[in-house]
Amino acid sequence: MKILGNIIPHFISSLDGFSRREIISLAYISIEHILGFNKSDCILNNYFVLNSKQINFLKKIVINLKNDMPIQYILGETYFYDLKIKVDKSTLIPRGETEELVKWILEHKFSSVLDIGTGSGCIAISIGHNSDALISALDVSKDALNIAQLNANMNNVNINFICDDIFKYNPKMKYNVIVSNPPYVLNNEKIYMSKNVLDYEPHLALFVNDNEPLIYYKRIIHLANKYLTKSGYLFFEINEFFSKEIINILEEFQFVNIELKKDINGKERMIKAIKK
């Protein structure tokens, strides 16, 4: 693996459990992270000689991939809404579906946003990077907020980060937008999830008790009813199997213009509601 052209064959021969297409994609992601070369650069620099540090890093990547560690955690970063975002095991890996939620939010006019359960800060930071809004972001995890602050600094976005428990927290101001991608995966759904998610991503940010699947939504809707401005927007990412129940709760709190939106995979994944 001393020569650039040998990296992809080495990945292919070393990794099983991935499709060939996935392996090649992982190899290119690793090469770009370590060498800064894109696919075209790889073709033009096929005989580029790697130093020992670069070779050792690539070997480490392969070992960790064989142990089912997500490439984002191995490299310590990913991209979200065209922004580089640092991640570690205290934060969820941002998903493409959440980019769709951000895109939807940015189609509206607003001057203030509260992101509840911010994790890596990807939602708050991408909104802040693409608007002039005043943004606050809440999380119960100090470790996650440390990563979120690094991401805000790295992307030159000013965010007011708050470390608190959503079940105890009460905002000090009203917001035009409240958004949340709260834990919504049931514990009994673990059997359907991949090993790399179960072994590495933070369960606190993923799972809810089977007996209280909507506990976070109920609390956030209650807060939004008090702390959204009139005609303010509430946005959620949701478990596709609980869309009707969440809509019912919103209607109980007299939210209006409730809109359910499917993600790119055709799953009911996002809800928007307006405070009356």
Please identify what each model-predicted range represents:
Residues M1-L58:
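A short N-terminal interaction module
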Residues H33-E107:
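Conserved AdoMet
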Residues Q72, V185-N188, F241:
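Active-site beta-alpha loop architecture of Rossmann-like, nucleotide-cofactor-dependent enzymes
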Residues K84, L134, N158-N160, V256-E259:
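Conserved beta-strand segments of alpha/beta enzyme cores
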Residues G96-Y192, R219:
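Conserved SAM/SAH cofactor-binding pocket of Class I
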Residues I127, V197, I220-A224:
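Class I S-adenosylmethionine-dependent transferase superfamily signal
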Residues Y184-I215:
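Mobile active-site "lid"/loop adjacent to the S-adenosyl-L-methionine
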Residues D210-I274:
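Conserved Class I SAM-dependent methyltransferase catalytic core
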